[in-house]
């Protein structure tokens, strides 16, 4: 009997030892999984996260590092001939030079001619209500201030032609010094209209350059615009001759409704 009891106790101890070791292994495995899970849920420092999420290259905006013709999907109409000045000549390459810009003011007589008030009869108004000065009036004011031949418009870039637009940069030079730089633009509807559009582009640049000389500065004054439209202009309901659509347009009080409206 003693031997039998000893065997049973030994077997129980063996089973208990085996069961305990199994429990320990399970607990140990569970602890390692919990540690592994906790480690994976740890939020990295802000600097580490930023470094990990930072792209390898800087994201550029559309059109970055592109020429204007590439951005507009246009083509260059011609390659301008650049005049290279030599050390022995006084010739200036106006395509790249900024000679005389802001160096000295013009005479009082010239300034008075440039800043004189516009004649109300010279100002026109578009059907949408935008008032403007015709391009030929700008040329007359420049001729009065600097004299014929005392000023000129020189190109500063190539002529860029897109599917619907012609654009080019010009500089206004008066009495041998640069005054202003502006980019002209003009729409066109067919290829046969490109030559005319290039002239319209030049005229548009001239009018923009004249803003720096103070010519017609009141055209950008909201108070003057309201007063001029109230005194010299009116709105009328008209009908388009072709489409028969009715709309309201602006025109001067001394003008009649013209085609294509009636």
Swiss-Prot record:
Asked if the record carries the keyword Aminoacyl-tRNA synthetase, the reply is: no
Asked whether the UniProt record includes DNA repair among its keywords, one would answer yes
Write out the GO biological process terms.
Answer: interstrand cross-link repair; mitochondrial genome maintenance; recombinational repair
Disulfide bonds listed in the record: none
Q: Name one GO cellular component term.
A: mitochondrial chromosome
Q: What is this protein called?
A: Mitochondrial genome maintenance protein MGM101
Protein family according to the UniProt entry:
Belongs to the MGM101 family.
InterPro entries, sorted = Mgm101
Instruction: Tell me the classification of the organism that encodes this protein.
Output: Eukaryota, Fungi, Dikarya, Ascomycota, Saccharomycotina
The GO terms describing molecular function are:
single-stranded DNA binding
Which UniProt keyword terms apply here? DNA damage, DNA repair, DNA-binding, Mitochondrion, Mitochondrion nucleoid, Transit peptide
Where it sits in the cell: the answer is: Mitochondrion matrix, Mitochondrion nucleoid
Q: What does this protein do?
A: Performs an essential function in the repair of oxidatively damaged mtDNA that is required for the maintenance of the mitochondrial genome. Binds to DNA.
Encoding gene (name)? MGM101
What Pfam families does the annotation carry?
Mgm101p (PF06420)
